[in-house]
Amino acid sequence: LEAVRKVAPLAASLKEKHGIEFFSIGGGIGIVYQGTLDSGVQEWWNEDCAQLTLSTYAQAVVPTLQPLGLHIIVEPGRLIVGNAGALITRCLYEKNGKAKTFKIVDAGMNDLIRPALYQGYHEIIPVREYPSESCVTADVVGPICESGDFLAQNRDMPDVRQGELLAVLSAGAYGFSMSSNYNSRPM
């Protein structure tokens, strides 16, 4: 909201001098990638940070922009689709080193680049329920021969075994659009 207030005078000047008709706020309405499952989704929605909706966002922004007489454009893509997608991957095998445990899965950085590219956090949960005492700290890595091919590092997680499925959550935004067939892997 502060950014909108700061740029509104510039938009008014541009409208007057150049006849602009649109004001694009862009995106930037984030989603929660971490912690949504700690206490349950329903309880999370009662937190203050969860109260930002398109409606509350509009109620905050429109009074500042409406006097400009411009068409307001919002790009809420991630808010709409971010948590609507999950990447399902299978644990191929486990590698236990002296200092680290690795869960090697069949999805790699070509499927979801965010963790490798800019350390984007995604909850990773087993598709089936696990007893809470069956946990391990592990790196979840893909099958691509790259040191950066990881979906999670030093993650406390259920101790899944070979053949079991994991869901990498919040993969709906940019997951597919940023995917590639790197290393001749199918998308």
Residue ranges and their predicted role:
Residues 1-90:
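Active-site loop/helix belt of alpha/beta enzymes
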